[in-house]
Amino acid sequence: MSHDGKEEPGIAKKINSVDDIIIKCQCWVQKNDEERLAEILSINTRKAPPKFYVHYVNYNKRLDEWITTDRINLDKEVLYPKLKATDEDNKKQKKKKATNTSETPQDSLQDGVDGFSRENTDVMDLDNLNVQGIKDENISHEDEIKKLRTSGSMTQNPHEVARVRNLNRIIMGKYEIEPWYFSPYPIELTDEDFIYIDDFTLQYFGSKKQYERYRKKCTLRHPPGNEIYRDDYVSFFEIDGRKQRTWCRNLCLLSKLFLDHKTLYYDVDPFLFYCMTRRDELGHHLVGYFSKEKESADGYNVACILTLPQYQRMGYGKLLIEFSYELSKKENKVGSPEKPLSDLGLLSYRAYWSDTLITLLVEHQKEITIDEISSMTSMTTTDILHTAKTLNILRYYKGQHIIFLNEDILDRYNRLKAKKRRTIDPNRLIWKPPVFTASQLRFAW
């Protein structure tokens, strides 16, 4: 079974040895006291015993992992993939497809950019608000990758998204973390059981001895940039990708372990990185970060955003999002994150947008327009309307759309206030929007 779910069921066969297991076959694997059907994506025989990289069918890709042979149930049949069509059949299929395409050469020119009709482009379809920027919900995995932006922080190699996770465990400070995805660390590190990543420089090592020797000599105790925000809880540093290429590339390599579609680890020059840290007696420990393009043609205020796994589910994600909008307010701009968001990223943004909109509407207590909400929050009108529709507070009344507050919204507002979650204090932000000339925005300036 492929990730897009289009491949037909395979051929069931009983086997006696794991030597008969091949890539793309499916077998039953022990996982958390239950058996799950898993697809073999890769086989590693460089070290004994052999290991198999598996994707659990109908489960999230971040659960993919390396397993040993003892977890594979050979008592059940293995599904082998069906043989692909012969080369002659493929040629006929391609020829037929080319003929069909040539019959309507003007089809692609009938529509506007990105497939939108050139007519009625000023009309907003409130039933089809697309906060993810993906046109078709039925789009396949391969088509989705092809449609990703080729600028910003999107991966530009479609095969890269499907690569096998190459690191087993990383040790960062006092935390041991299991990566989720592939990241292009040096190949000599991929056979190590643990990779050591320095808490402050993000430099990586294949052995504990190398790491400890490096740590004794290194004096850096915070991200190598300007501290632009500090309160009793967190600090924020601004780092220019051009001025701190090595550190920013190390950051991108680390974040790629936990982000699937996003990848930028060589060309960091066009980006600014805003890193959130927690302080202790040792220094500033990285909690999460977001990056943004120095000049975004699409008006994005965030390119990549990540809270490190050891700090997730603690409220740091909302602080990162809130801080990105505080920067947009300082710039007197509206902004939105680069699309598509990861599943966790979309959940975090939806929660932030909902909380922000509910708080504003309840506390404002006067009539207010969508444009005024956008100006006060720096959220785009599309994100505001999407959030209002999700909250079910958008209604069509007497020829216009209105937002109304119901009891559920008021109850949610009261619960928000009772939580007393931490927020960003705009008065503690010491920052002016950086200005770059055309020559400064060019690569290798």
Curated annotation (Swiss-Prot):
List of residues that carry N6-acetyllysine: 262
Residue ranges covered by zinc fingers (C2HC MYST-type): 195-220
Reported effect, residue 315 to E: Loss of function
Effect of residue 250 to A: Strongly reduces HAT activity
Binding locations of acetyl-CoA: 303-307, 312-318, 342
Catalytic activity: L-lysyl-[histone] + acetyl-CoA = N(6)-acetyl-L-lysyl-[histone] + CoA + H(+); L-lysyl-[protein] + acetyl-CoA = N(6)-acetyl-L-lysyl-[protein] + CoA + H(+); 2-hydroxyisobutanoyl-CoA + L-lysyl-[protein] = N(6)-(2-hydroxyisobutanoyl)-L-lysyl-[protein] + CoA + H(+); (2E)-butenoyl-CoA + L-lysyl-[protein] = N(6)-(2E)-butenoyl-L-lysyl-[protein] + CoA + H(+)
GO terms classed as biological process: DNA repair; DNA-templated transcription; DNA-templated transcription elongation; positive regulation of macroautophagy; positive regulation of transcription elongation by RNA polymerase II; positive regulation of triglyceride biosynthetic process; rDNA heterochromatin formation; regulation of cell cycle
Phosphoserine PTM positions: 17
Site (Important for catalytic activity): 304
Known outcome of mutating residue 260 to A: Strongly reduces HAT activity
Gene3D superfamilies: 2.30.30.140, 3.40.630.30, N-acetyl transferase-like, Winged helix-like DNA-binding domain superfamily/Winged helix DNA-binding domain
InterPro entries attached to this UniProt entry: Acyl_CoA_acyltransferase (IPR016181), Chromo-like_dom_sf (IPR016197), Chromo/chromo_shadow_dom (IPR000953), HAT_MYST-type (IPR002717), MYST_HAT (IPR050603), Tudor-knot (IPR025995), WH-like_DNA-bd_sf (IPR036388), Zf-MYST (IPR040706)
Residues spanning the signal sequence: none
PTM characteristics: Autoacetylation at Lys-262 is required for proper function.
Effect of residue 253 to A: Strongly reduces HAT activity
Enzyme superclass (EC): transferase
GO CC list: chromatin; NuA4 histone acetyltransferase complex; nucleosome; nucleus; piccolo histone acetyltransferase complex
PROSITE patterns in alphabetical order: MYST_HAT
Coiled coil region boundaries: none
Annotated function: Catalytic component of the NuA4 histone acetyltransferase (HAT), a multiprotein complex involved in epigenetic transcriptional activation of selected genes principally by acetylation of nucleosomal histones H4, H3, H2B, H2A and H2A variant H2A.Z. Acetylates histone H4 to form H4K5ac, H4K8ac, H4K12ac and H4K16ac, histone H3 to form H3K14ac, histone H2B to form H2BK16ac, histone H2A to form H2AK4ac and H2AK7ac, and histone variant H2A.Z to form H2A.ZK14ac. Acetylation of histones gives a specific tag for epigenetic transcription initiation and elongation.
Subunit record text: Component of the NuA4 histone acetyltransferase complex composed of at least ACT1, ARP4, EAF3, EAF5, EAF6, EAF7, EPL1, ESA1, SWC4, TRA1, VID21, YAF9 and YNG2. The complex interacts with histones H4 (HHF1 and HHF2), H3 (HHT1 and HHT2) and H2A (HTA1 and HTA2).
Family: Belongs to the MYST (SAS/MOZ) family.
Note: Present with 1170 molecules/cell in log phase SD medium.
Protein name per Swiss-Prot or TrEMBL: Histone acetyltransferase ESA1
